C-alpha cells in the first residue's frame, strides 16, 4: 500500500463508514480499482464519434490545479484529485465540471480544457466555499 493510501485509510471517514462487498469496509484499494474501471469506461465512451463539444461531469476532480489549498503537497491529495489531463487532451474536452474537493475553481488547463467546480459543500461550508447559486456556464 502506498503512503498516500495508508494516510487515506486512517484519515478519510469513507473508509470507516461505507461498506463494500463481502461485508468488509471500503478501502483505498477498492476506490482505486473503481476509479480505474470508471476512467477506462469514460475513455471508451469519449472515443465514440459525435458532433459538438465535449463536456464531462464527474464527482472527483480531474486535474492537479483542483487541489484545495489545505491539501497542497499532502498525502491526501490523491484522494481528492487525479490527473486526467491526458484524457482532456486526447479527447479535446472543452469543459470538465467536478465536485468532491469542497473548494471551487475555474481555470483553463494547459490542454485548453476549462475545469470548473461550483460546490456548495456540507452544511456550514457555503459561506466559505464561494458557491455561486446563480452560476451559468456558457460553452
Tell me the role of every PLM-derived stretch.
Residues 68, 74-94, 102-139:
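Binuclear metal-dependent phosphoesterase catalytic core
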Residues 59, 100-102:
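Histidine-centered divalent metal-coordination motifs
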Amino acid at each position: 500500500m502506498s503512503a498516500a493510501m495508508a494516510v487515506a485509510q486512517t484519515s478519510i471517514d469513507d473508509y470507516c463508514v461505507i461498506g463494500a462487498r463481502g461485508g468488509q469496509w471500503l478501502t483505498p484499494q477498492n476506490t482505486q480499482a473503481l476509479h480505474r474501471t470508471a476512467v477506462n469506461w469514460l475513455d471508451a465512451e469519449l472515443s465514440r464519434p459525435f458532433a459538438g463539444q465535449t463536456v464531462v461531469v464527474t464527482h472527483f476532480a480531474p486535474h492537479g490545479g483542483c487541489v484545495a489549498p489545505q491539501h497542497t503537497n499532502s498525502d491526501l491529495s490523491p484522494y481528492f484529485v487525479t490527473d486526467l489531463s491526458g484524457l482532456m487532451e486526447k479527447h479535446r474536452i472543452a469543459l470538465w465540471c467536478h465536485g468532491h474537493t469542497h473548494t471551487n475553481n475555474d481555470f483553463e488547463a494547459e490542454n485548453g480544457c476549462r475545469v470548473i467546480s461550483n460546490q456548495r459543500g456540507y452544511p456550514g461550508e457555503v459561506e466559505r466555499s464561494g458557491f455561486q447559486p446563480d452560476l451559468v456556464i456558457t460553452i
